[in-house]
């Protein structure tokens, strides 16, 4: 004799092993905005329909095996739970892809900004600060005019981390290597030298 699943124990989708959605050599599919996605549907203002207008269009399923409304409500809960699990998985995949792209972009930026060979891997904020300093240095080098705003710039960056530092010495930045400019403008939040 077969026993049906108890109502209080919902059935879940079995765990599906992670597989890439596309081949490693192919780029990921483009992300389509919601408005473009629903543009192909005949009626885009579905939210304007009232429930009383939509209800007659949806067929009512008769209860099977003479069960009461309790079983139909449990199947709705299971369906809703399965849908939410699928939505969570899709959101997790999107978040993983976003973080992967973000980390990849930071790695590319780290390869472009000048650093010392023996330096540890820069954090994201250190990478961004070094890139800002390097871009500023290169702009000053191209224009031939040194910037006189070093004090305000270091105060801004120091306060971003909650650390305050003494104003940098009056050195012309076009005489410095970009890595030296980085050391001049940004003190380590851990009170140790980056070199």
Curated annotation (Swiss-Prot):
Region of interest called Disordered, as start-end residue ranges on this chain: 1-24, 56-82, 145-175
Q: Name one GO biological process term.
A: negative regulation of DNA-templated transcription
State the source organism's domain of life: Eukaryota
GO cellular-component term (any): nucleus
- List localization entries: Nucleus
List, in alphabetical order, the Gene Ontology terms for molecular function in this entry: DNA-binding transcription factor activity; DNA-binding transcription factor activity, RNA polymerase II-specific; protein dimerization activity; RNA polymerase II transcription regulatory region sequence-specific DNA binding
- In which broad location class does this protein mainly occur, judging by the first location in its UniProt entry? nucleus
Domain bHLH: start-end pairs: 86-138
Keyword set includes Transcription: yes
Keyword terms of this UniProt record? DNA-binding, Nucleus, Repressor, Transcription, Transcription regulation
Return the Low complexity bias intervals: 63-75
Under PANTHER family, the record lists: BASIC HELIX-LOOP-HELIX TRANSCRIPTION FACTOR, TWIST, FER3-LIKE PROTEIN
Q: According to its UniProt entry, what is the function of this protein?
A: Transcription factor that binds to the E-box and functions as inhibitor of transcription. DNA binding requires dimerization with an E protein. Inhibits transcription activation by ASCL1/MASH1 by sequestering E proteins.
Q: What is this protein called?
A: Protein Fer3
- Supply the source organism for this entry: Drosophila melanogaster (Fruit fly)
Top-level taxonomy:
Eukaryota, Metazoa, Ecdysozoa, Arthropoda, Hexapoda
């Amino acid at each position: 004799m077969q026993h049906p699943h108890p109502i209080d124990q919902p059935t879940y989708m079995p765990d599906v092993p992670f597989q890439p959605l596309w081949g490693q050599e192919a780029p990921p599919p483009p992300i389509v905005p919601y408005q473009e996605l629903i543009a192909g549907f005949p009626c885009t203002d579905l939210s304007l329909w009232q429930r009383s207008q939509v209800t007659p269009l949806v067929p009512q399923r008769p209860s099977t095996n003479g069960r009461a409304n309790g079983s139909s409500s449990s199947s709705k809960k299971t369906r809703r739970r399965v849908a939410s699990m699928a939505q969570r998985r899709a959101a997790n995949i999107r978040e993983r892809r976003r973080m992967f792209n973000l980390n990849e972009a930071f790695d590319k930026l780290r390869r472009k900004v000048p650093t010392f060979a023996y330096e540890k891997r820069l954090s994201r904020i250190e990478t961004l600060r070094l890139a800002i300093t390097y871009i500023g240095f290169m702009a000053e080098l191209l224009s031939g005019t040194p910037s006189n705003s070093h004090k305000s710039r270091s105060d801004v960056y120091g306060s971003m981390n909650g650390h305050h530092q003494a104003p940098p010495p009056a050195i012309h930045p076009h005489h410095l290597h970009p890595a030296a400019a980085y050391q001049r403008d940004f003190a380590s939040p851990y009170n140790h030298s980056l070199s």
